[in-house]
């Protein structure tokens, strides 16, 4: 993965266009965002969770920071497509989060719409990161034929999960 802007990782400066250490970036962000996303999810859907202002501050600050890193790492075009695809995939996100809530005996309809903003944004950021990791693990980012195949498998896998 080639960086879209300068980024310092563990005190080492990586310049725009240089390859980033994907074995650091993906595990770090998957774990870090997983923890923040999980805490945001649990707070949003807890029986006696925090008020909406705290939920938005907790999630909003972290989500903003993640988007800034995504822009530096993946670039504006990829991040733009993340939000376009998220807009198109809201139904899938709705189904997936509703299924997760069902594991706790709850549903999306049990909460006001405003509560869903933070968990939905975390879901979008996390699935974007998974797709980027898959493109790099399969070395298909710069190979159009392989990239189309990997993306098709990603879409089919997502549809299987939504189904």
Region spans (language model):
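Membrane-interface helix-loop-helix junctions at boundaries between adjacent transmembrane segments
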Residues: 12-20, 50, 106-116, 133-150
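N-terminal juxtamembrane cytosolic/stromal segments of multi-pass membrane proteins
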Residues: 1-40
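Hydrophobic cores of alpha-helical transmembrane segments in multi-pass inner/ER membrane proteins
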Residues: 2, 33, 60-66, 119-131
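Cytoplasmic membrane-interface regions of multi-pass membrane proteins
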Residues: 67-83, 129-147
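C-terminal halves and exits of single transmembrane alpha-helices
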Residues: 87-131
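Alpha-helical transmembrane segments of integral membrane proteins, especially early/N-terminal helices
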Residues: 12-23, 72-89
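Membrane-helix interface and helix-disruption motif detector
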Residues: 39-59, 75-81, 100-119
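Final/C-terminal transmembrane alpha-helix of multipass membrane proteins
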Residues: 147-163
